[in-house]
Amino acid sequence: MQTIDSSSSAATTETLQIGHRQFQSRLMTGTGKYDDFETMRRSIAASGCEIVTVAVRRVQTNAPGHQGLAEAVDWNKVWMLPNTAGCQTAEEAVRVARLGREMAKLLGQEDNNFIKLEVIPDSKYLLPDPIGTLEAAEQLVKEGFAVLPYINADPLLAKRLEEVGCATVMPLGSPIGSGQGIKNMANIQIIIENATVPVVVDAGIGSPSEAAQAMEMGADAVLINTAIAKAQDPVMMATAMGMATQAGRFAYQSGRIPVKAYASASSPLAGRISS
């Protein structure tokens, strides 16, 4: 990925702090939906991401397409984010989270306590259960997990999850895998403005411009899987998503000009040539 001259103020971008870890990249990626492991590995590398999420249940059960998945990634280079995808209740999510922590340890990340919390009883729209998510989050925080909960763009729920000790909040941009982009910008903006933990826009981002849009709003990071894995050229799309995420963050930090209802000339009026 293209680097920025260290003399530029943009190079002072602060690191992303989640739990006890710091990260340079603000793009998180996934491991699902790739045609093969080699494409997945190359895409992860091209994206420049440092956090990669893995569905614990699918790895544990050797679901089709997931056999050998955990071993296919070089976990010395990226941080594993186990997730509870497929869990329909809080109790199930807590059990799977514990398995995820053990899986991370077995793969060499002894101090990895991260868990992406997903409680999704709805198999059609894949919308997260707010009550089950809150219940599971409270228990997992008590057990020492750094909880990254996947939620609807609900500012009140986001604040409550922050209050119980979650390490981030992860509001969806639009339904998982839909590629619809950011459909609830107003609520996500409220979440960003009121959060004291990182806000990660997760799900629905379909293009680099949408990744940049999320970052320009002030999101701390984005998580993108389907848009990369199912692109015609996943490796190239991963590169584009990494660049867009970085560009969006720089744009947010640099401060865009205000929107005006009238024109403002770029050139001074003084010294005009008149007839």
UniProtKB/Swiss-Prot annotation:
Binding site for 1-deoxy-D-xylulose 5-phosphate: G177, A203, G204, N225, T226
Keyword Transferase carried by entry: yes
Domain of life: Bacteria
Entry EC number(s): 2.8.1.10
Primary location: cytoplasm
Coiled coil: none
Annotated keywords: Cytoplasm, Schiff base, Thiamine biosynthesis, Transferase
BP terms from Gene Ontology: thiamine diphosphate biosynthetic process
SUPFAM superfamilies tied to this protein: ThiG-like (SSF110399)
Active site: K116 (schiff-base intermediate with dxp)
Enzyme superclass (EC): transferase
Cytoplasm keyword on record: yes
Pfam families reported in the protein's UniProt record: ThiG (PF05690)
Catalytic activity from the UniProt record: [ThiS sulfur-carrier protein]-C-terminal-Gly-aminoethanethioate + 2-iminoacetate + 1-deoxy-D-xylulose 5-phosphate = [ThiS sulfur-carrier protein]-C-terminal Gly-Gly + 2-[(2R,5Z)-2-carboxy-4-methylthiazol-5(2H)-ylidene]ethyl phosphate + 2 H2O + H(+)
Pathway it works in: Cofactor biosynthesis; thiamine diphosphate biosynthesis
GO MF, one example: thiazole synthase activity
InterPro entries xref list: Aldolase_TIM, Thiazole_synthase_ThiG, ThiG
Signal peptide (residue range): none
Entry GO terms, CC: cytoplasm
PANTHER family membership: THIAZOLE SYNTHASE
Role: Catalyzes the rearrangement of 1-deoxy-D-xylulose 5-phosphate (DXP) to produce the thiazole phosphate moiety of thiamine. Sulfur is provided by the thiocarboxylate moiety of the carrier protein ThiS. In vitro, sulfur can be provided by H(2)S.
Membership in a protein family: Belongs to the ThiG family.
Protein's name according to its UniProt entry: Thiazole synthase
Source species of the chain: Acaryochloris marina (strain MBIC 11017)
